[in-house]
């Protein structure tokens, strides 16, 4: 396993990840990928370790993926649900985390609707002198590092299944389309893709794509065509209705007419173009159903599988820095 230069105790953001660190994750995930296709889909790597999934915000894909990743590594797993917890009785988030610490948690996977909560808990664990690794599973509009890493792994293994490395994306044009404003996935992907040297283009209506996103190192387009022109990969993002406080698009129908990814529209892209979506997908809104279901064009199922391998890698790497 490639852990010799891994020094992170927590994974909270991809903004300060180096290309070398990204490569460590890619290489480690690639080694675990084979486990997923074996008859016995389990290794004893994290036997007797306790992983706690503290999801203060609803999640199906991410929580299930982290849980399965931990179990594939033979870890014990505790899942937290705020609806049936002492939070409803007035307990603070930090006290909840300390409760799981007292139960012997080695790693905490945290999702919260407000930005900064995983960082706050990680800092609290450090201040207490506890060697507990914290992984950000999505916080508000901030970031979703494991999704960014699994998308990176999906892209790189598509280009080279045997040796996925960051240099494969150097100069590749990647279009990210949709609700960039509310997307923590977009922020994590921007950080990692720019670090890899990719040519990143963002497309969306001005209400969902502020021009300040150019500061990330991407090109910003308020129409779809220039972003798709000769693109190698197209990543479309879900309209995040639950995070919108105002009516930022005229209608779902008009959004699809202007920014929906369809078979006709990807004719502008490279002939070998592939399409991604972090899920859940609003069929017929962000992407047409026929394109989503076309195995020759859609990488969406591969993203799900990649997520397990990448989260196995993160838990493994973090575990070497925790107690």
UniProtKB/Swiss-Prot annotation:
Q: Which Pfam families match?
A: OTCace, OTCace_N
* Any one Gene Ontology BP term: amino acid metabolic process
* Database matches in InterPro entries: Asp/Orn_carbamoyltranf_P-bd (IPR006132), Asp/Orn_carbamoylTrfase (IPR006130), Asp/Orn_carbamoylTrfase_sf (IPR036901), Asp_carbamoyltransf (IPR002082), Asp_carbamoyltransf_Asp/Orn-bd (IPR006131)
Keywords assigned by UniProt, alphabetized: Pyrimidine biosynthesis, Transferase
Give the top-rank taxon of the lineage listed in the UniProt record for this protein.
Bacteria
Q: In what pathway does it function?
A: Pyrimidine metabolism; UMP biosynthesis via de novo pathway; (S)-dihydroorotate from bicarbonate: step 2/3
Q: What class of enzyme is it?
A: transferase
> Cystine bridges: which residues?
none
* EC number(s) per entry: 2.1.3.2
Chemical reaction(s) catalysed: carbamoyl phosphate + L-aspartate = N-carbamoyl-L-aspartate + phosphate + H(+)
Annotated residues for binding of L-aspartate: 89, 184, 238
- One Gene Ontology cellular component annotation? cytosol
Q: Which GO terms describe its molecular function?
A: amino acid binding; aspartate carbamoyltransferase activity
| Subunit field text | Heterododecamer (2C3:3R2) of six catalytic PyrB chains organized as two trimers (C3), and six regulatory PyrI chains organized as three dimers (R2).
Query: Cross-referenced HAMAP family, in alphabetical order?
Result: Asp_carb_tr
- The protein's role, per its UniProt record: Catalyzes the condensation of carbamoyl phosphate and aspartate to form carbamoyl aspartate and inorganic phosphate, the committed step in the de novo pyrimidine nucleotide biosynthesis pathway.
| Name recorded for this polypeptide | Aspartate carbamoyltransferase catalytic subunit
Species lineage, top-down? Bacteria, Bacillati, Cyanobacteriota, Cyanophyceae, Acaryochloridales
């Amino acid at each position: 396993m490639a852990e010799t230069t891994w020094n992170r105790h927590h994974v909270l953001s991809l903004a300060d990840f180096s290309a070398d660190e990204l490569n460590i994750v890619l290489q480690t995930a690639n080694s675990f990928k084979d486990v997923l296709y074996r008859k016995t889909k389990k290794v004893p790597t994290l036997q007797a370790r306790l992983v706690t999934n503290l999801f203060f915000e609803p999640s199906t894909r991410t929580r299930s993926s982290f849980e399965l990743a931990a179990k594939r590594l033979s870890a014990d797993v505790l899942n937290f649900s705020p609806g049936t917890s002492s939070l409803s009785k007035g307990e603070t988030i930090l006290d909840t985390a300390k409760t799981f610490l007292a139960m012997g948690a080695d790693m905490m996977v945290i999702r919260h609707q407000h930005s900064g909560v995983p960082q706050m808990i990680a800092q609290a664990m450090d201040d207490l002198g506890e060697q507990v690794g914290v992984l950000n599973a999505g916080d508000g509009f901030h970031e979703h590092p494991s999704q960014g890493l699994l998308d990176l792994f999906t892209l790189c293994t598509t280009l080279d299944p045997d040796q996925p490395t960051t240099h494969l994306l150097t100069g590749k044009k990647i279009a990210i389309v949709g609700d960039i404003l509310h997307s923590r996935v977009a922020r994590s992907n921007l950080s990692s893709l720019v670090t890899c040297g990719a040519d990143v283009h963002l497309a969306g209506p001005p209400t969902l794509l502020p021009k300040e996103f150019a500061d990330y190192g991407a090109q910003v387009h308020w129409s779809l065509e220039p972003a798709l022109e000769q693109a190698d990969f197209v990543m479309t993002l879900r309209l995040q209705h639950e995070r919108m406080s105002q009516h930022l698009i005229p209608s779902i129908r008009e959004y699809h007419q202007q920014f929906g990814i369809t078979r006709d529209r990807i004719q502008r892209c490279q002939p070998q173009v592939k399409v991604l979506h972090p899920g859940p997908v609003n069929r017929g809104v962000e992407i047409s159903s026929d394109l989503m279901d076309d195995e020759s064009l859609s990488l969406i199922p591969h993203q799900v599988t990649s997520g397990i391998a990448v989260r196995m890698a993160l838990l493994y790497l973090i575990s070497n820095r925790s107690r």
